[in-house]
Amino acid sequence: MGTGPKYKRILLKISGEALAGEQKTGLDFGVIGQVCDVIKTCTELGVQVGVVIGGGNFWRGVKNGEGRMARSRADHMGMLATVMNCLAVSDVMEQKGIPVRVQTAVEMSTFAEHYTWERAVAHLEEGKVVLFGAGSGCPYFSTDTAAVLRAAEIGADAILLAKNIDGVYSADPHVDPSAVKYDAITYDEVLAKHLAVMDLTATSLAMENDIPVVVFALADPQNIVRAVMGEPVGTVVTK
């Protein structure tokens, strides 16, 4: 392995819950600051970074709607939650001197740029971090699917999936103590074994576009740098 980063352009997916830290809801600016510091390290290594952030720390469309409101409207609220997170993260990045742009799938020009892949790529090539808000802009599609979509559009070398678990397991390790962690696995195996990496739509899209996914725990934000460098961390999912 060389001394430089393994991946030159990445799409980092961070759940909204991760930004809430121990409090589970809202924003933990200590956690956000740590994540921003690590992203800054990546950019200083010459890595171009796009980020999709979930919104579950404020609102989860399907779960919070509980069938008492239209699914599309509940998902629209989830999209707005992701934009709130993007604005918070971008503010912390600006305080730290990190060049950043927020782009949203739904036009809201007062807050952010409207997403186009051409403009996103131009920002990345100029060394800016691009935060993608509002998911894919369509209800019924998860932010994991939005992350894979954006990764494909910007030509990312890999998707870094920062979760609350340190990789892909044969079963839920919180339920089954005999669950085995995979260091590497194929998309076909993930689909055949119904493993909880991403939802089916996101997994299929990543496989179709041959984009590797690195699944790791965000509990130690330095795992982001380790993943970028190609060091053993979490689970690598490939075609």
Predicted regions and their residues:
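C-terminal catalytic "cap/lid" subdomain
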Residues: 1-239
